[in-house]
Amino acid sequence: MKDLLNFLKAQHKTEEFDAIKIGLSSPDMIRSWSFGEVKKPETINYRTFKPERDGLFCARIFGPVKDYECLCGKYKRLKHRGVICEKCGVEVTQTKVRRDRMGHIELASPVAHIWFLKSLPSRIGLLMDIPLRDIERVLYFEMYVVTEPGMTDLEKGQMLTEEEYLDRLEEWGDEFTAKMGAEAIKDLLGSMDMHAEAEQMREELETTNSETKRKKVTKRLKLVEAFIASGNNPEWMILTVLPVLPPDLRPLVPLDGGRFATSDLNDLYRRVINRNNRLKRLLELAAPDIIVRNEKRMLQESVDALLDNGRRGRAITGSNKRPLKSLADMIKGKQGRFRQNLLGKRVDYSGRSVITVGPYLRLHQCGLPKKMALELFKPFIYSKLETRGLATTIKAAKKMVEREEAVVWDILDEVIREHPVLLNRAPTLHRLGIQAFEPVLIEGKAIQLHPLVCAAYNADFDGDQMAVHVPLTLEAQLEARTLMMSTNNILSPASGDPIIVPSQDVVLGLYYMTREKINVKGEGMYLSGPAEAEKAYRTKQAELHARVKVRITETVVDEDGNSTTETKMVDTTVGRAMLWQIVPAGLPYSIVNQKLGKKQISNLLNEAYRKLGLKDTVIFADQIMYTGFAYAALSGVSVGIDDMVVPPAKYTEIAEAEEEVREIQEQYQSGLVTAGERYNKVIDIWASTNDRVAKAMMENLSSETVVNREGEEEQQESFNSIYMMADSGARGSAAQIRQLAGMRGLMARPDGSIIETPITANFKEGLNVLQYFISTHGARKGLADTALKTANSGYLTRRLVDVAQDVVVTEHDCGTHEGVDMMPHIEGGDVKVALSELALGRVVAEDVLKPGTEDVLIPRNTLIDEKWCQIMEENSVDSMKVRSVVTCDSDFGCCAQCYGRDLARGHLVNQGEAVGVIAAQSIGEPGTQLTMRTFHIGGAASTAAAENSIQAKNNGSVKLHNAKFVTNKDGKLVITSRASELTIIDEFGRTKEKHKLPYGSLLSKGDNDAVEAGETVANWEAHTLPIITEVAGRIQFVDMIDGVTVSRQTDDLTGLSSSEVTDAAARPAAGKDMRPAIKLVDEQGNDVMIPGTEMPAHYFLPGKAIVNIEDGAEVGVGDTLARIPQKSGGNKDITGGLPRVADLFEARKPKEPAILAEHTGTVSFGKETKGKRRLVITRDSGEVYEEMIPKHRQLNVFEGERVERGDVIADGPESPHDILRLRGVHAVTQYIANEVQEVYRLQGVKINDKHIETIVRQMLRKCTITHAGDSEFLPGEQVEYSQVKIANRNLEAEGKEPARFERELLGITKASLATESFISAASFQETTRVLTEAAVSGKRDDLRGLKENVIVGRLIPAGTGFAYHQERQAKRAEAQEGPSAEQATDNLAALLNAGFSSDE
């Protein structure tokens, strides 16, 4: 018996492994896998249904059809296992060996493997340096190739047509050999000397100058080196033996009616075997060459079809005209092996049903229908019944359960107690889409769900279904309880805000409860506490909204956790005092002493979590919900048509607007305004009218007049149902009420442009036919968009997860001093996001000093929590350096200090947390809320007047940043630098506003001057770019010849004349090389120098510049010499929403990107070509850099101006690749983070920056080697950044020269495919290409990421699996050291003793 158990144990023993290697298999290797050669194309005998011998299903090769029984039936039963029957040759064993025993086919002629031939770039072609077309001609028998030139003038690898071959044959006889077919290619590959090739190419690389040649050689060199390193032999890309898949993986299933369903592979194999056998016979018969050749070609084609059908030529089709599914099709695509069976599987012990509300449940509970529970927990019930002795066997237990005896229900109750179940709602967009609950048995057939978790699941009760899963093992139950229980997931992993937030009814109830009303019963009472307030309310002595004074006792918990109580009289209402009863101790009364809307309630829960911890918050959340539902029911809020009050002012407003539109129409007809201006103006008029009507309506709805106790009239907030719903945030918004009671307003066409006739009616008044038609027009587009959006958003999430899946927190601290600089987000005059909000949950990278002193306020490596945020606010810190995932120094994954706080848990992130996947989910999940459309700046959307001044919005002082300026004769400052910024700082030194200062602005305030709110600080001309002189002197024109380089115009009205510089292209031949300029001279006619430099004050004039001053005039410092008219930035569509986010993460180059300065230096312009200008930057070292710029681009720089590397030379959207190259990693991180946040902020979605940074880290994981140093890398090769870091560390330790490199920014799709792990890349996209490349270079996958481990079926190295993997590696390290000699002796003795004692 014992050996039987051991035998059964040995049946499913899995090998422990740490890596997977892929490579090319040699013919001998294929033969060694094989259990015999398949010689016949037959499958099974159609009469006996037994497999044919030597056929595709042969039992002798692949194993028995029935467990422990040979084919002829001579040996049956377990006792004969391992015997090989002498009659039929079948081994007696389990039938499951038919799943893993392979066969093989000996090919009569070699065949090229199509993946290495046709998967671009063709590996065979690249290796032999012969174009793919020629190789195909040889393989498919259209041409000869010379394999041995002998003493002739032919070259090895030369192609010959049939005629040429025959000619040469006559000329040289058998001096040389030329062959066709795969055999020829095999000979050529076999005769290549890899090492010699590599040497030769290395020399070529050093000598060649042409870039294209270098690229080509590098590519080929990499391939050759891969072959050398991996030990693959190039000959193996040509098959001489074909492996045959085990038969149970390509089954033949009998259908009823005597027909068979078969896998397509059997058809494909049959074809190969038939052609192979025919070829063997033809070769034995010595058939004519042409027939053999044709057969060989057909064999090649049939093997191609088996490996990858349809890759070359037309796909082979089956009987029903459907292309056959080849081996390659089995693994790729959504239905392929990787994505269908390895990454997502169907599971047992699960059920699904419709969900309904469970308002009486606690937060950790869900209602589970009894029927469902009984089915799901069957095994547990059976075992309980048996251990209790209520059933003798499992079968009896099964009968009891089927009869549903009373005792079964009792046992079900026991089994379910404290056994959590998982609830999941598809689509699972983030990790909160699966949570654990304790089941409560209920009657009925619907699952009951706690209302507060709906937000996390994005569920509602209009027919949504949910799936239930049962965690079976103890470990699984433990994880479900500690990690996935709904009570442990109160905060959203995306933003760290509470996600268990009441909505709708609950909000309405609490809002109603905390409102106040003037002069109702009980006003002015003095109450001794919340309990008495409740008594007064219950006995109808006071109304819920009555203003009263109540004695309130607060508990205050200080830093050290000591609590003190304070009692005071508070002006409040009866409802608020009653609500105070459920608020846990430790929160201030002020937090409920206000009208509670959705925002306030969210804040209340957040405070509770931060101050009181998890347990109290959960209990509080439940209480809030029960209370909210109760008072919502009591409030009796409903919607009636009379609640929508149309403001009387509406009709006059509309009449006025129609009058204005009529005026503009008249102006248009008389030609005073253009069609575009008319359209924009009309839309502006209607948009502002709509706003005014809406304002009047809201004022009307939101307040009512009442009589107070003194008998005077007073305004109070209205108790109008619709207004209360919107004001509390329960349902609806001002925009929707506007359509009900104001006017519907402007509608959009499906393409996003705005229809200029608005709908002046509202829904209460009703729409006429035309209005209805206009409103359906844009509304249908919305529905179509939603469907597209979901698919697109899902695909974005998939790409994000794929790129970030291997970012796991692997260590506590990587020790880096790097980080990113944090500043508050300021746009114009508003602080959009405060610094404390940005820094919350981050770790400080460098000591933060107290502003204005050298004292350390926050030491390095401090995790910024709410307490520190307060200290920062108090000390008005306005910038700090925090650690970031992008700058983390860990080789694999990232470290806890660089990541900072785990947003969903509120403490420093744990090791093993899969932060990459969380980042991907956090960015992808709100994707469905983003819009699909590109915003047309049409009319009201955003035609802000061009700015031409800065007005201060706050009191404070002015600060100028990288500004150069001169003071003009009026004592104003004139800005003469490009990228200047002006900030306004309050008395604590905090930045309040940030404005861009264009070149030529006039400042009325200097640096550090005080400014008051509302003052104008700077102004400039909006549509012209001035050229300003920095010195005083007399003007002298250079090369300004009338009619050649300039044209003069005199204004008829004013009589003033001005000269306009002609574009170089439009000048007559004489003026082509002239460069018009203005130079400044002193009285004697000598050049005036620009102060502080050796450069004369020369101002070159670009084309289109207008000069208003005369030659010889005197000018002062800061005067304008010339003006260049600027085109106004026409209506560009800005891509918004999802497409914009996708563009950013795919790192796509914009159409016309901004041109940035490649170097720091001085700008000048060189010789122009037909359509381009030549921009020259002279560096301080004297080196010259030139760039050609198209003429139509408007440049921001003048001749002789200094630029810094990375400065904008021509405006446009910036390309992230340029930012990375010129401004570095920090700048590109900031750029992508800000741009992505911009899109999400518009939709009101909060995402923490660190998620975006995590993705950016993955986009930056490759770099290009610029100089190899002493490393193994090739210049120009793309390598994983971590590899270079490790290599350089080792080189530096040995005192050698490290490699130099440039970081690369890859889009997320590219980055996923460029990952180290070929398993992960293959399961993402382009499976064939990835696997081909991996096989050729003999790649090894170390299974570091999550995806690879899921695919090979191991625990993932994250979360609880992280510890498991660490322990395993430690054990292995120990085992490798091995036991000492004494230990080994002891072990042996112990074993022998144990053996003796057991036999007695």
UniProtKB/Swiss-Prot annotation:
One GO term in the molecular function aspect is: magnesium ion binding
User: What assembly does the database describe for this protein?
Assistant: The RNAP catalytic core consists of 2 alpha, 1 beta, 1 beta' and 1 omega subunit. When a sigma factor is associated with the core the holoenzyme is formed, which can initiate transcription.
Q: What is this protein called?
A: DNA-directed RNA polymerase subunit beta'
**Do you know which InterPro entries this protein is assigned to?**
DNA-dir_RpoC_beta_prime (IPR045867), DNA-dir_RpoC_beta_prime_bact (IPR012754), RNA_pol_asu (IPR000722), RNA_pol_N (IPR006592), RNA_pol_Rpb1_1 (IPR007080), RNA_pol_Rpb1_3 (IPR007066), RNA_pol_Rpb1_3_sf (IPR042102), RNA_pol_Rpb1_4 (IPR007083)
Q: Which UniProt keywords apply?
A: DNA-directed RNA polymerase, Magnesium, Metal-binding, Nucleotidyltransferase, Transcription, Transferase, Zinc
Q: Coiled coil where?
A: none
Q: Which Gene3D superfamilies match?
A: 1.10.132.30, 1.10.150.390, 1.10.1790.20, 1.10.40.90, 2.40.40.20, 2.40.50.100, RNA polymerase II, clamp domain, RNA polymerase Rpb1, domain 3
The record's HAMAP family line, in alphabetical order, gives:
RNApol_bact_RpoC
Q: Quick one: a GO cellular component term?
A: DNA-directed RNA polymerase complex
Entry annotated with the keyword Zinc: yes
Q: Where does Mg(2+) bind?
A: 460, 462, 464
Q: Which organism is it from?
A: Vibrio parahaemolyticus serotype O3:K6 (strain RIMD 2210633)
Region ranges (Disordered): 1368-1400
- A single Pfam family it belongs to is RNA_pol_Rpb1_2
Please list the residues that bind Zn(2+) 1.
70, 72, 85, 88
Q: Which reaction does it catalyse?
A: RNA(n) + a ribonucleoside 5'-triphosphate = RNA(n+1) + diphosphate
Cofactor, how bound (note) = Binds 1 Mg(2+) ion per subunit.
Keyword Transcription listed? yes
| Residue numbers binding Zn(2+) 2 | 814, 888, 895, 898
| Entry similarity comment | Belongs to the RNA polymerase beta' chain family.
